Amino acid sequence: MAATKHSLADSEDRPTKKTKVDSEEKARLKAEKRERKEKKKSQESEPSAENSDADRAAEKERKKAKKAKKLEKKQKLAEAEASAEPAAEVSDEAPKKSKKEKKTTTTEASSNSEAPSSGSYIQTIALSNVPQAEIDEFLSKNEIHITDPKTENVTLRPVLEFHQLPATNLLEKKPSPFANYKAPTPIQSASWPFTLSGRDVIGVAETGSGKTMAFALPCVEAISALKHKHTKAVVVSPTRELAMQTYEQMASVAALNRMKCVCLYGGASKDDQRNLLNRGADIIVATPGRLKDFMSDGTVDLSHSAFAVLDEADRMLDKGFEEDIKMILSSCPPREKRQTLMFTATWPQSVQTLAATFMVSPVKIAIGSGGKETAGGAVELQANARISQSVEVLEPRGKEFRLLEVLKEHQQGSKKNDRILVFCLYKKEATRIENFLSRKGIRVGGIHGDLRQEQRTRSLEAFKSGQTPVLVATDVAARGLDIPEVKLVINVTFPLTIEDYVHRIGRTGRAGKTGQAITFFTVEDKSHSGSLVNILRGANQPVPEDLLKFGTTVKKKAHDMYGAFFKDVDMNAKSTKITFD
């Protein structure tokens, strides 16, 4: 390799090695510069005698003003009966935080941002100006019973009219989410002040009482402040139809705040639902089974969901979803860091236990004549008093032709297109009844578990539109479905439990309107006679003599095929140790 040549100029440009003389010269120049700087500083710091006195006087005045300011702050704190800790916070010279403390504070702030805003509800002047007598009359008339474990005297007033709600981003949207409503329903009126305050709430109310909007409004309001892109809220429903119906209302409210809502249920394409989830879902409305599937494969993550709703909680427990519900709620943030709402038509021990496990000091709001608690803490089951109930005792073989007679009686003249809901106990029975009525010229549709999801949806839409005014259904449609203007409910076969009877007839007489229910009762249903008599009497309905012949004793719920519907144990009792001799 050839050596590289450098010119003389190049060598002169390169730095040379420093000598001892160069270092001493540099130190001397540095010392002289420091000496000149100190001399100049001392000259500037020598004030005249007059200036010195003036400065001292000004300093004294500043100290006096500072002392007076501190004294004034102390007096204000004393008047407000503040504790010593806030007083320390007001101090002018707050101690500096260490890096560790700053990091802890930042972490706490970020974790708090995951929870929905709480305590933001402020009662409006319009609501405060309502006379207490009017509030008491409203609570009494609608039989609203509110129980708050944190206080004996409930101070939050029910919202009687929409304009009495506090102004928020959602409520100020155009068109208003309440454009089609005249006034809040009782469950909405009583629950909104608590849910908008960030409290956990249990709503015990009949079906068709406006429960969906009761939780839709506070849900969207609460999660609007959350800035992360994960799922912020989850609503769990027992059936596909109820999930779809809830989704429609939730999506319309969420869209006002530009939020995305996704509905998950069985019987539909998983791939299509997964694609929707991958595009982002602020709110998920789902049935327990399908939601659990997506959680298991990692598609859905609820660890940031600060708002959870259990709709028709008692029905989900009846259908065996207890473990699924526990898994879903356990996947959400801890109960102290989320807001949980539960809506149910009944208040059995199983629902009470679920609430105690996953909710924090929930406010219980019960609506209706069955709202008062019994000695055991349960809410007595009663039917909607606006529904006219009649029971016909028949021979088992005569039910189909009697059904045909009833339908022809009610589909005359202006009532030709009135919606009539016919309930059967089994899927095969529903198919047989539907085919029988169709052969007799009745415009009829069906909805039960054997049908594909598209068929069920099509039948339901045809019934809602009036295209087929008669719908034959099993109990899958008995709970939660919002089918407006159902004039008549016919129970061809009595359900397995008296609770299901109440929920079936609850399909009519919704939203403050009246309705009618006709029940065919046979000797095969005699074990339910006592419970049915109690329901009829509780709603001031006539009890036929033929029904009384079966007896009025209320028997424990059991079925030859499905077994017992009860437990002879105290669910709250502590376990005991068994000792053998």
Swiss-Prot record:
Catalysed reaction equations from the record: ATP + H2O = ADP + phosphate + H(+)
Amino acid composition bias (Low complexity), ranges on this chain: 80-89, 106-118
GO biological process, one term: rRNA processing
Domain named Helicase ATP-binding: residues: 192-365
Record field: compositional bias (Basic residues): 63-73
PANTHER family registered for this protein in UniProt: ATP-DEPENDENT RNA HELICASE DBP3
Keywords assigned: ATP-binding, Helicase, Hydrolase, Nucleotide-binding, Nucleus, Ribosome biogenesis, RNA-binding, rRNA processing
UniProt short sequence motif DEAD box, positions renumbered to this chain: 311-314
InterPro entries, alphabetized: DEAD/DEAH_box_helicase_dom, Helicase_ATP-bd, Helicase_C-like, P-loop_NTPase, RNA-helicase_DEAD-box_CS
Boundaries of every Helicase C-terminal domain copy: 402-551
Sequence similarity: Belongs to the DEAD box helicase family. DDX5/DBP2 subfamily.
Motif (Q motif): 160-189
Entry's EC annotation: 3.6.4.13
One term under GO cellular component: nucleolus
EC primary class: hydrolase
Organism: Gibberella zeae (strain ATCC MYA-4620 / CBS 123657 / FGSC 9075 / NRRL 31084 / PH-1)
Entry note about domains: The Q motif is unique to and characteristic of the DEAD box family of RNA helicases and controls ATP binding and hydrolysis.
Bias kind Basic and acidic residues: ranges: 7-35, 53-62
Binding site for ATP: A205, E206, T207, G208, S209, G210, K211, T212
Protein's name according to its UniProt entry: ATP-dependent RNA helicase DBP3
Region span, Disordered: 1-118
